[in-house]
Amino acid sequence: MSLLAIGINHNTASVDLREKVAFGPDKLGPALEQLREHEAVNGSVIVSTCNRTELYCDVKQGARNKLIDWLAQFHQVSREDLMPSLYVHEEQAAIKHLMRVSCGLDSLVLGEPQILGQVKQAFSDSRDHQAVDSSIDKLFQKTFSVAKRVRTETDIGGNAVSVAYAACTLAKHIFESLSDSTVLLVGAGETIELVAKHLASNGCTKMIVANRTKERAQGLAEQFGAEVISLNEIPDYLARADIVISSTASPLPIIGKGMVETALKQRRHQPILLVDIAVPRDVEAQVGELNDAYLYSVDDLQSIIDSNIEQRKVEAIQAEAIVSEESASFMTWLRSLQAVDSIRDYRKSANEIREELLSKSLQSLAAGADPEKVLRELSNKLTNKLIHAPTRALQSAAEQGEPAKLTIIRQTLGLDDL
């Protein structure tokens, strides 16, 4: 049994190569079936995301080049094109790499939590295709517990490092409960969709989506039970909003100082948080001059993000220490399994010798042989049979001039205690 991890990621390979070597839904099943039948593979999991493609395998000795050849052939990529971007980790290094990946320590965004879900899904897919053996199963189960420990003992995932998440985090800090807040989302693009997802996951149920075309916003609104309005209707709805988060491609501001001033009067000066993550601005800078209007720009969020990235780097030091400790512990456990197999084989061999000689001795006794003679013969033959292999090993080590090996055998046999 030997653990092997091979792959490419955003640090080693271009987008073009990552696309060529990706395992999409149509390729994953056939690939796992091929690995399941591969002569050099006992068990495998394929992790394939937009930023990485990796194989984690329990393999027989000498499987490294065979797996690299398989990966290249499966995707019809030349080995020469693949090798400069490929990394290979074996045994404890493979264990540590998987744990680092699952904890977000090897991600493009340090500490991002999504990768753990992707690794769990990859493991589930492999189990569904009967591609997982006991060693791979135990490795991934251990990895998931390590990832949980890292999340529990460190705050590596607790600081916002995306604009969308930072906007929601800011809103949470200012308002005690998002479940009681009405949020006006201006725009319906990818960033606003991410904002809506973060808001919903934090209990926000009252959202209004404003967009230039209502049709484009309808799909987003249906996901979160939001109202849909046009940009022209914003002045009529602004007073209802406790929080405004805006991200459009408009060349000119959409929300002006006068519009916000009117809304604040209608709200009897209950404060409004405005988070403008558009470039160029969606909200006039002068809005920040108003009492009870708290305006944050994308630059303000970026300073929060930069600070949080530095904090994640600090937390990553402790996370790396946990991964190093846990990967070493798991490797020790794996090695002990190899000893268990050897001990079982050794006991089986000794029992077979005992049963063979005991059977012959019982036959002799049944035939009327002298009991004392039978017992002496049994003890002599049993001794000779049991010490035969160790004797040969001692002789071989001495003849080949291997004093270190000779010392190990003597210690194993307990000869130094005599």
Swiss-Prot record:
Swiss-Prot/TrEMBL GO biological process terms: protoporphyrinogen IX biosynthetic process from glutamate
One MF annotation (Gene Ontology) recorded for this entry: glutamyl-tRNA reductase activity
Catalysed reaction, written as an equation: (S)-4-amino-5-oxopentanoate + tRNA(Glu) + NADP(+) = L-glutamyl-tRNA(Glu) + NADPH + H(+)
Gene3D superfamilies named in the record: Glutamyl-tRNA reductase, N-terminal domain, NAD(P)-binding Rossmann-like Domain
Pathway given in the UniProt record: Porphyrin-containing compound metabolism; protoporphyrin-IX biosynthesis; 5-aminolevulinate from L-glutamyl-tRNA(Glu): step 1/2
Binding site for substrate: 49-52, 107, 112-114, 118
UniProt: NADP(+) binding residues: 187-192
Signal peptide range: none
Group of enzyme by EC: oxidoreductase
Important for activity (site feature) positions: 97
EC number: 1.2.1.70
Database matches in Pfam families: GlutR_dimer (PF00745), GlutR_N (PF05201), Shikimate_DH (PF01488)
Keyword annotations: NADP, Oxidoreductase, Porphyrin biosynthesis
Active-site feature positions: 50 (nucleophile)
Matches recorded under PROSITE patterns: GLUTR
UniProt family annotation: Belongs to the glutamyl-tRNA reductase family.
Free-text comment on this protein's domains from its UniProt entry: Possesses an unusual extended V-shaped dimeric structure with each monomer consisting of three distinct domains arranged along a curved 'spinal' alpha-helix. The N-terminal catalytic domain specifically recognizes the glutamate moiety of the substrate. The second domain is the NADPH-binding domain, and the third C-terminal domain is responsible for dimerization.
UniProt function note: Catalyzes the NADPH-dependent reduction of glutamyl-tRNA(Glu) to glutamate 1-semialdehyde (GSA).
HAMAP family: Glu_tRNA_reductase
Subunit text: Homodimer.
Miscellaneous comment in the UniProt entry for this protein: During catalysis, the active site Cys acts as a nucleophile attacking the alpha-carbonyl group of tRNA-bound glutamate with the formation of a thioester intermediate between enzyme and glutamate, and the concomitant release of tRNA(Glu). The thioester intermediate is finally reduced by direct hydride transfer from NADPH, to form the product GSA.
Name this protein carries in UniProt: Glutamyl-tRNA reductase
